[in-house]
Amino acid sequence: MERERCPQCGARWLLPARQSREVVADDGVRLTYADELTACLSCGERYYKHQQSLASSRARAAVLRKHAGLLTPDEIRAFRERHRLTQAQLEALLGTGPKTVVRWEKGTVCQSRAADRLLRLLIVNPKNVEFLAARGGPDDPAVAAGSPGDGPR
């Protein structure tokens, strides 16, 4: 099998390189995480292969998630599986967009604080799952119109 070539210069002198990356959390705190990419020893080009890019996204999200005290991907998956929900069903229950839960469970994206709080309410009281399921999803006319006693929107 032929060795991979540098996309910049065509050389075959490629090695994995580690670097420390910085990200700023919502509260302004600077956080660092380890990142791996590919470096060409010939021209100095540095780039991500697909798996390195995914790993970088996961590492970035993990440091932000830990700092914010959000549920982990494993905790979200365990909750969903315990209630025998598919990812699409949980998305409908929460009113999120398509593939949102997939990204949370893969660890490539952090859930918002609001979504995290809602998930925690569902975790501590399974009756909340039943309550939301009974109300339907965001496209349900009964939900869109609100219920009697709802305040102004």
Regions picked out by a protein language model, each given a short descriptive name:
Residues 48-114:
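Extended interfacial segments that mediate partner engagement and assembly in macromolecular machines
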Residues 95-153:
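C-terminal charged interaction modules
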